[in-house]
Amino acid sequence: MGRRKIEIEPIKDDRNRTVTFIKRKAGLFKKAHELSVLCQVDIAVIILGSNNTFYEYSSVDMSNLLNVHQNNTDLPHNIIEPSDYGDYVKKPRVVLNERKRRRRRATVLQPASHSGSCTVSSQDSSSVQNNGNLSAPLASNDAGNAGVSTPLVHCHGAISRSGSNHSDCARNSADYQMLQGGLNSGGSFHANDYKESVDQQHVANEAIHRNFMNKRIRPDTHLLLSESNHSNYHNFYPSPYENLPKPSLPASLVGNIPSFQSQFVQVIPANSNPMGKGFNGTGDSESFEAKQKIHPTVAISNTLEGPAPVQAMVHHLHQLNSNRGKLSGKPYLKLNIPKATNDACQRSPAMYSGTASPKTDVQATPNQMLASNMSSPLSRSKFLGFKNNDMDDLYHNGRCGSTYVNNKTFFLKPPIGRPPKFPKSPSSSIVVFPSSVASSTLKSTSSTNSPD
């Protein structure tokens, strides 16, 4: 980046003159030294300052160099005078007027044809400076050019608004009115009224845009606000299912069916606010709270009445009542053993107690084993004991693991793994098989129930 050229003339300011002298003197001495070293020449520089001070630089002895310069006439002298560099005459000052620069920048480029190309105004710079006139902005009424030219239009003329079409262009051209207050007969306005005209035009553009926004299709808010006394906010977007025919319910089910809420389904109204905040759409503030409620057992008279949705609801209520009845009491298991067979079966593993050692071998009777607490080493789940195929006489202590039916001993073997959470069918939860072990030879390691 080069330095700008300055005008060579005497500096009138003392401070600027002193600074310029110091800088240029140092530069001159530096160049003289570089020249003497690079080119192997003798250089002597003498400067007499304005303060009557000599500033000298010499690559050799100054007195010897001056003696040779004055006395030796045989040496040629190449003398350069100030006229060899040209006569520096003061040029006319270039005055930068900010007001004129703004006028030139705001000059309107008028479109020469419908294609949008622009040409510079025919007025020259002298007429602009003398009269201060600017060409007036012209409204573009072409159907293919959707936009209005402004005083700050760039090189391609019209400015198109995004989303505008031919109908927007026709509406804008019909509603837009040029401001004629500041225009003169020559089709231009004075520069003094430039700012006011621009502000007025900006206000007019905002009014056009506001009118365009008002013409958009919107729902009738007056009818909606008139019915805003009750909080039916879903009426803004009506559901298409409201007009469908609804099935009729029999008279026996109308009084017994509550609102469809259970421990499995949580129903929240469409116009409720789950967070507990209020709606301020129409000025009123209402808060809604959705709580999960479990209704008591419902008595259904007849499950075959009513349409299919009602039957599904009745089935759901029956299932709910059944689950509540099961969960209210202890889990139980019904096991039916028709008769004992003499087929050879897998022998049951030995029963060990948690307190006794497996090495202890103590004989026990079936009655003692039924009364004892036993568990299988394969699983820590609880067993249910039965006697004489009687399902009502149950050992419900959860520790008995055998039964005595028709002189045969049966063991209840639970599945290996995690026991079921809810009672299931016997075929999938417990396997029952007879044992060929005689009742007199049964082994038990329970030290507390063993005979003395």
Swiss-Prot record:
One of its GO terms (molecular function) is DNA binding, bending. Phosphorylated by HOG1. It is found in: Nucleus. One of its GO terms (cellular component) is nucleus. Gene3D superfamilies: Transcription factor, MADS-box. Residues 115-127 have a biased composition (Low complexity). Residues 97-142 are annotated as: Disordered. InterPro entries: MEF2-like_N (IPR033896), TF_MADSbox (IPR002100), TF_MADSbox_sf (IPR036879). Signal peptide: none annotated. GO terms for biological process: cellular response to osmotic stress; positive regulation of transcription by RNA polymerase II. Residues 58-87 bind DNA. Residues 3-57 form the MADS-box domain. It comes from the Eukaryota. Keywords: DNA-binding, Nucleus, Transcription, Transcription regulation. Can heterodimerize with RLM1. Interacts with HOG1. Belongs to the MEF2 family. Transcription factor that controls part of the HOG1-mediated osmostress responses. Binds to the DNA sequence 5'-ACTACTA[TA](4)TAG-3'. Does not appear to function in the MPK1 pathway. This is Transcription factor SMP1. It comes from Saccharomyces cerevisiae (strain ATCC 204508 / S288c) (Baker's yeast).
